[in-house]
């Protein structure tokens, strides 16, 4: 029996460079060492932070334009006690969400729109590429080129409200 099956009935998807089995169950991946199990138990990526200028325009972009769900918008405090908001959005049915974090200071403001160093940093998979592309164009989303066919499907690059590059990918 593989180490993946021994831990929550997962399936083996390959092996890491360090020799650990890469296991998969549903949308959760984890590493299981050949020495007797997972070094960290089941692991999933819960949130990815995106630094934004202001919360409300970012919420409107992700919810109204990209059809994400607003999962949480709660008052919170910075590490030094100043007020902020805890804002999480995610695609419907997805396990991983985006934490919309308002820039706090010049260093954080400097990375707005550059979080992936001018590379595509985010990948949005859709079931109906044509409909998603048309809806986003109607909402005046900035695309960096026309859709193209790749071995994995249709793809085009767009910018989010902050200027981060995303791939829109569909069949």
Where are the language model's segments positioned?
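Core segments of cupin and vicinal oxygen chelate
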Residues: 49-96
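Active-site beta-strand termini and strand-to-loop segments that position acidic
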Residues: 89-93, 158-161, 171
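N-terminal beta-strand motif that seeds the catalytic metal site of vicinal oxygen chelate
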Residues: 35-59, 120-122
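Intrinsic low-complexity, disordered N-terminal segments enriched in polar/charged/small residues
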Residues: 11-13
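Vicinal oxygen chelate
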Residues: 54-56, 111-165
């Amino acid at each position: 029996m593989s180490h993946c099956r021994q831990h929550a009935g997962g399936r083996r998807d390959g092996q890491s460079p360090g020799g650990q089995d890469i296991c998969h169950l549903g949308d959760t991946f984890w590493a299981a060492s050949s020495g007797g199990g997972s070094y960290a138990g089941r692991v999933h990526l819960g949130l990815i932070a995106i630094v934004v200028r202001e919360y409300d325009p970012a919420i409107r972009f992700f919810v109204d334009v990209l059809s994400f769900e607003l999962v949480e918008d709660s008052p919170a405090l910075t590490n030094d006690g100043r007020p902020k908001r805890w804002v999480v959005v995610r695609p419907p049915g997805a396990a991983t969400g985006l934490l919309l974090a308002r820039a706090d200071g010049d260093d954080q403001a400097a990375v707005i729109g550059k979080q992936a160093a001018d590379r595509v940093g985010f990948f949005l998979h859709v079931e109906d590429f044509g409909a998603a592309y048309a809806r986003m164009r109607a909402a005046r989303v900035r695309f960096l080129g026309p859709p193209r066919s790749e071995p994995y499907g249709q793809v085009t690059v767009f910018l989010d409200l902050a200027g981060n590059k995303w791939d829109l990918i569909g069949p």
